[in-house]
Every structure is written in C-alpha cells, then in structure tokens.
Swiss-Prot record:
Cystine bridges: none
Entry's Gene Ontology cellular component terms: cytoplasm
Pathway: Cofactor biosynthesis; coenzyme A biosynthesis; CoA from (R)-pantothenate: step 4/5
Gene Ontology BP term (one): coenzyme A biosynthetic process
Protein name: Phosphopantetheine adenylyltransferase
Amino-acid positions noted as binding substrate in the UniProt annotation, renumbered to this chain: S8, K40, T72, R86
EC number: 2.7.7.3
Cell compartment(s), UniProt: Cytoplasm
Swiss-Prot/TrEMBL keywords: ATP-binding, Coenzyme A biosynthesis, Cytoplasm, Magnesium, Nucleotide-binding, Nucleotidyltransferase, Transferase
NCBIfam families linked to this entry: coaD_prev_kdtB (TIGR01510), cyt_tran_rel (TIGR00125)
UniProt keyword Cytoplasm, yes or no: yes
Amino acid sequence: MIALYPGSFDPLTYGHLDIIERAARLFDRVVVAVLRNPAKVPLFTVEERLSQIQKAVRHLDNVEVEAFHGLTVTVARRLDARVLLRGLRAVSDFEAELQMAQTNRTLATEIETLFLSTSTEHSFLSSSLVKNIAAAGGPVSHMVPEHIEKELRTRFAGAPL
C-alpha cells in the first residue's frame, strides 16, 4: 500500500522525519510530497526542500520525495496512494487536520487520512519555530538534521537579530 505524506516542510524537522520513518515501517511505499504554493514565500525553494528531504531519508529504501501543487487528493490518485498521512503534535492540531481530512474525504472517498501522533520528544517542534530560533541565532541542532541546520545558518548569516 502507498501512503502520501504532504506538507511544505520548510524546513523538514525531526518531527517530520519521525513520522516518515514510522510510516516507512507501516507501508510498502511512502511518498513525501513537498507543496509548491505560489501564494506563500518559503524560506527554502521547493528544489532546496526536495534535496534536504532526500538527503534525510536516503536510509529508507521505500521512501520517495517529489514536489506537487494543486489538490493533495489529485496527487494521491495519480500515485495510487490510498492513505494520506498527517502528523499530530497536540490537540490543537486536531481540529484543522480533521477539517482537512473531512474535506479530502468529500473530494476522494477512496482515500483515507491516517493521523500519527508525533513522538513526545518532538511534540513541540514546528518549522516556524525552527526558523524563528535559527533567525535569532539560537541552537536548532536538536530540531533538524545536521545538513538542514547548516543551511539555516547559511541562510540567516548576517541577518539582523
């Protein structure tokens, strides 16, 4: 069975990676789909995020990474994915995620949404938090893989504090 894990991943955190690694044990194939959203200005380009994630998951043979735009269910259908994966950090995530799952269900009744709770040690993480801390010169090595930490440091080098 194929599972699709969509998101912006700007940047990928250890929380995201935890979900990907656990999903890789549950499914035959996991596709990490990086959102290309022209309405948002990301810190990293789609190409940079694809590269970051590919490097982080290279130890997982059944995980692929690709970019997408448009409806998630359209991508899922194209890939023949029957499951959309979503990570939940806290109860506060649930309401928005449930609404999205119900919306996706109305668009594609054959596709299920599976919620995986983030491991406790990563439950506080978000890409926004990582960017804010990195922008202020704070440590993020416990939040993101080393290669992403280096890219964050480079991106924010010389940024005003």
